[in-house]
Swiss-Prot record:
Subcellular location: Cytoplasm
Job description of the protein: Specifically methylates the pseudouridine at position 1915 (m3Psi1915) in 23S rRNA.
Assembly behavior: Homodimer.
Identification of the protein by name: Ribosomal RNA large subunit methyltransferase H
Chemical reaction(s) catalysed: pseudouridine(1915) in 23S rRNA + S-adenosyl-L-methionine = N(3)-methylpseudouridine(1915) in 23S rRNA + S-adenosyl-L-homocysteine + H(+)
Keyword Nucleotide-binding listed: no
Family (UniProt): Belongs to the RNA methyltransferase RlmH family.
SUPFAM superfamilies linked to this entry: alpha/beta knot
GO MF entry, a single one: rRNA (pseudouridine-N3-)-methyltransferase activity
Organism encoding this protein: Mesomycoplasma hyopneumoniae (strain J / ATCC 25934 / NCTC 10110) (Mycoplasma hyopneumoniae)
InterPro entries: Alpha/beta_knot_MTases, RlmH-like, tRNA_m1G_MTases_N
Main subcellular localisation: cytoplasm
CC annotations in GO: cytoplasm
Taxonomic lineage of the native organism: Bacteria, Bacillati, Mycoplasmatota, Mycoplasmoidales, Metamycoplasmataceae
Gene3D superfamilies tied to this protein: 3.40.1280.10
């Protein structure tokens, strides 16, 4: 069982220890974490850049994955609701590039992809990856009735 996280840019070395700590906590739930790091396009035209990067994302989505894109226009979910998304053996989370993604192209090419939001704040990719990992761990803790999550 695997969770893939597609994002742009590599992870800074000083953050790898934090990611590894979260990944090790998730492993107890029998899931592997795979980072798929893509390179941002240097295209100056923002709409073209988003389209090219979206095409790159679509090519990298693992087959037979339940897939979710993080976007500020996505559905805001509670930790409990997020835990219900973790009911598949292969899950893919997408973090778009610095200008986002071509959401129309995503919806047209893969209408099965869910759009999620963790609120209206904007985060650096390195921080958001850590937030996603923590929420995956929290979600599994809720799903398997572990004592990590204390809110209703």
């Amino acid at each position: 069982m695997k969770i893939s996280i597609i994002s742009f840019g590599s992870s800074p070395r000083e953050w790898l220890g934090l990611y590894k700590k979260e990944i090790n906590k998730i492993k107890q739930f029998k899931y592997q974490i795979e980072f798929i790091n893509l390179s941002e396009h240097s295209q100056e035209n923002i709409e073209l850049k988003k389209m090219l990067e979206t095409k790159d994302i679509l090519q990298k989505i693992p087959k037979n994955s339940s897939c979710y894109l993080f976007t500020e226009r996505g559905k805001t979910v509670t930790s409990k609701e997020f835990s219900q998304l973790l009911n598949f053996s292969n899950i893919c989370f997408i973090i778009g590039g610095s200008y986002g993604v071509d959401e129309k192209l995503i919806a047209k090419s893969r209408p099965d992809i869910g759009f999620l939001s963790f609120g209206k704040l904007t985060f650096a990719h390195k921080i958001f990856k850590l937030i996603v990992l923590e929420q995956i761990y929290r979600g599994f803790s809720i799903k398997f009735n572990r004592k990590y999550h204390h809110a209703d």
